[in-house]
Regions:
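Ribonuclease/tRNase effector modules and their secretory precursors
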Residues: 1-56, 60-224
Length: 224
């Protein structure tokens, strides 16, 4: 019995050392089961939106959309500094810029929201202010179809066939924006107003996150 207990003790010690070794080696970068990587995976499965100020910051640092994805993937999360109470959580991340300098920034995440806001200009969750500016889709999960809706009922020519979801997805990510001032971000299931230029007009639609897509509630042309 003593021999068995001794072996179990050594096994437990070795297992614990192995876990610590893996954790410090990967530092939230390679283990999908770590809390930090679960958060980052949830972020990258949604649409990261940036306003004009954050876009200007990225331009100044010469960081592309692909660079933002890499930045998030390689960042670590400080849960002790993050504000994670309530439906919408604000996480503090530590990353590295292309020039080698460190960057402390913020990301907000709501489980029932398809949109994630990023703030490269602040590092304290208490200082984070939701922008009322126009938000541009910057980083998103690569899939052909991000939208679901009753296309035949909207009455917009060119968006009635089976190709409507893919067509709208392409237009939104290449030319569209989210009108953040009209978004209801405090609800249990946030809804957003999306603007998409199309053939000299602007299509306005509202939608919410459902089964990893944007469920379209309304879709119409913008009135003058």
């Amino acid at each position: 019995m003593n021999t068995l207990l001794r072996r179990l003790k050594y096994y437990g010690i070795g297992f614990g050392i192995g876990l610590l070794f893996v954790f410090f080696i990967f530092k939230q970068k390679g283990c999908s089961w770590t809390p930090g990587n679960r958060v980052k995976e949830a972020v990258l499965n949604r649409i990261i939106v940036a306003d004009s100020l954050d876009l200007a910051f990225l331009k100044g640092q010469k960081i592309s959309a692909a660079g933002v994805r890499t930045l998030v993937q390689n960042s670590s999360i400080s849960f002790s500094e993050s504000a994670i109470k309530g439906d919408r959580k604000t996480y503090v991340l530590f990353g590295e810029l292309p020039n080698g300098k460190s960057l402390k920034y913020l990301i907000t995440l709501h489980d029932q929201d398809f949109m994630v806001e990023v703030d490269f200009l602040h590092s304290n969750p208490a200082a984070f202010q939701r922008t009322l500016r126009e938000g541009k889709p910057l980083v998103y999960k690569p899939q052909k179809n991000w939208f679901h809706g009753a296309w035949d009922t909207y009455g917009i020519a060119g968006f009635k066939g089976a190709d409507a979801p893919e067509k709208l997805t392409s237009l939104f990510f290449s030319k569209g924006s989210i009108e953040l001032a009209s978004s209801s971000r405090n609800e249990a299931k946030p809804t957003h107003r999306i603007m998409v230029p199309y053939e000299g007009k602007t299509i306005v639609l509202t939608g919410f996150y459902y089964q990893e897509k944007i469920e379209v509630q309304e879709m119409r042309y913008q009135t003058p």
